[in-house]
Amino acid sequence: MHTRAIYPGTFDPITNGHADLIERAAKLFKHVIIGIAANPSKQPRFTLEERVELVNRVTAHLDNVEVVGFSGLLVDFAKEQKASVLVRGLRAVSDFEYEFQLANMNRRLSPDLESVFLTPAEENSFISSTLVKEVALHGGDVSQFVHSEVATALAAKLKLAKP
């Protein structure tokens, strides 16, 4: 029985789609670790600490969810956390090929680590952090796509970034 799962991502910022998958993973596994990646190849709008804090706020009502920032290989982080499952989201068919390659690479690096794929609720299937930031950057209302605290933090972050 798999009891510890990791849902990894950049979460820049966490969206309602992410939150939906976290809620469902929390029902499937005894303990869910949200692994927030410090990915040097991406240039996140929020710092790692800010992303950890936002995800903590959004998931505070879930007793079996823990939020941890990490850097390095995901398989090494999973081993450190004693997790045997990776939870990944599939929004569309276009996500499948990349996720399939990633799952196979992770399996090659850590044969005992399983990947489990969840699809978001239909109303969240098109939401991505990138699209949310783009809408917010152009002054659009993102409150239907993210938690209210995330919308507030994103508005403040963008206001500070304007010249």
Curated annotation (Swiss-Prot):
Substrate binds at residues 10, 42, 74, 88. Keywords: ATP-binding, Coenzyme A biosynthesis, Cytoplasm, Magnesium, Nucleotide-binding, Nucleotidyltransferase, Transferase. Its cofactor is Mg(2+). Gene3D superfamilies: HUPs. GO terms for biological process: coenzyme A biosynthetic process. SUPFAM superfamilies: Nucleotidylyl transferase (SSF52374). CDD domains: PPAT. Its EC number is 2.7.7.3. The record marks 18 as: Transition state stabilizer. It is found in: Cytoplasm. InterPro entries: Cyt_trans-like, PPAT, Rossmann-like_a/b/a_fold. Pathway: Cofactor biosynthesis; coenzyme A biosynthesis; CoA from (R)-pantothenate: step 4/5. It is an enzyme of class 2 (transferase). GO terms for cellular component: cytoplasm. ATP binds at residues 10-11, 18, 89-91, 99, 124-130. GO terms for molecular function: ATP binding; pantetheine-phosphate adenylyltransferase activity. Homohexamer. Belongs to the bacterial CoaD family. Reversibly transfers an adenylyl group from ATP to 4'-phosphopantetheine, yielding dephospho-CoA (dPCoA) and pyrophosphate. This is Phosphopantetheine adenylyltransferase.
